[in-house]
Amino acid sequence: MKTFGKKVVLIGDGSVGSSYAFAMVTQGVADEFVIIDIAKDKVKADVQDLNHGTVHSPSPVDVKAGEYEDCKDADLVVITAGAPQKPGETRLQLVEKNTKIMKSIVKSVMDSGFDGYFLIAANPVDILTRFVKEYTGLPAERVIGSGTVLDSARLQYLISQELGVAPSSVDASIIGEHGDTELAVWSQANVAGISVYDTLKEQTGSEAKAEEIYVNTRDAAYEIIQAKGSTYYGIALALMRISKAILNNENNVLNVSIQLDGQYGGHKGVYLGVPTLVNQHGAVKIYEMPLSAEEQALFDKSVKTLEDTFDSIKYLLED
């Protein structure tokens, strides 16, 4: 591979993409930030708007409009482009149309001579990330999905509101599909080593509060989409966080979507959100959280759902 740097190419300048661009500029994560979209006037305006704010960025960043040839020397290509999720539509129902869009985009990226890392956010993210990996033949650690990073943040926030602590003080994870079969790993959730599940049960006298928090976490996107059309701030910040871990070689453990190779019950091939070490070499090490028997069964169900869905679009891997 080429010398590692901090050039990022964003493909997709919709609500998620533009919010991600804003987050990257305000955090000063990239040295060069290129935006690609078929809506070229929108890109031109966003580039102008963002560059007007770079004087306030913590480090210099050059924001520009680009084309696919700009991917040739990119360190990180982030794809948010795709058909949006409609009110009442599940992420998995998006699968065929967004896989076709993804195939076209990725072919153009690879034709440029791209030799960096992919970060996928378009939905259904686990399916599309696996598709990109299998279509390109790149090593799994270089094809990463946003996974359940956002879902875990939602869970941490909701728990923090119940317990009166900062969200960053909550150690809790959502794993599995970024979607309806995701699961909260209550057996490991804690604040300062104290079980969140037990604390919630003690405070309320029942197990209902934990279930309520899980459901509100799982269904948050549906509620937001119903009210304002799409979710974008939360996922944009999650993408910035993953990008920062890669570009700054942070060695952070994040619940990205990555390909299993025998972990969590022997599953192989499937992409889904699990705790993974992320640095400048990509998603390099999966951490296996101890799961209860019930949690393992839910995880297995999530795997099957994703496997069955991927089987339905496998034919698109053929040129």
Swiss-Prot record:
Active site, per annotation: 178 (proton acceptor)
CDD domains, sorted: HicDH_like
Glycoprotein keyword on record: no
Extent of the signal sequence: none
UniProt KW keywords: Cytoplasm, NAD, Oxidoreductase, Phosphoprotein, Stress response
Pathway of action: Fermentation; pyruvate fermentation to lactate; (S)-lactate from pyruvate: step 1/1
Reaction catalysed by this enzyme: (S)-lactate + NAD(+) = pyruvate + NADH + H(+)
Family to which this protein belongs: Belongs to the LDH/MDH superfamily. LDH family.
Role played: Catalyzes the conversion of lactate to pyruvate (Potential). Contributes to S.aureus growth during nitrosative stress in both aerobically and anaerobically cultured cells, despite playing a secondary role in this resistance mechanism.
Subunit record text: Homotetramer.
This protein's name: L-lactate dehydrogenase 2
